């Protein structure tokens, strides 16, 4: 029986609006593409979420991916508030689930920097019953340890949890830990999947 709903944040309770953010600076399409490839599309971007290195050290790493757009990279990363926008349904959905008796948690790859600069988009977090951000644990999904850490921290039974994430590899990692998991695309698509698990 499912008692606990665990949400990813990016592209689940928020929209990851990196393209809109980069284009908001008025760069040409070519420059926007280069900045994206050097930053949000790069492997090094995950270091923000891992929370081990200092922000400036990570930014220096990203600049090395394409030094020709260093100025633009630094400009985009100096103001990251536009990277995330809250989904309108976030708080109502959380409250509805809690009213029905479910406990609601978050488990997300998220950076200190984004958390600081996107506070308004994350105003639903205080409504939740708890959760884990990758930067705080120095672990990132799909590492199995981060799922185990959430279960241990809140004394949750894996068989009583369902996890919603927009990335298939993270869904599969949750299932490997005995957690029911749904690949999230939209709330409308997720509701019948939750219902199949007995979540009303």
Where are these regions (language model features)?
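Generic structural signal for small/hydrophobic residues in well-ordered secondary structure
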Residues: 8-11, 51, 97, 106, ...
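Alpha-helical elements of Rossmann-like donor-binding domains used by nucleotide-donor carbohydrate transfer enzymes
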Residues: 20, 43, 57, 61, ...
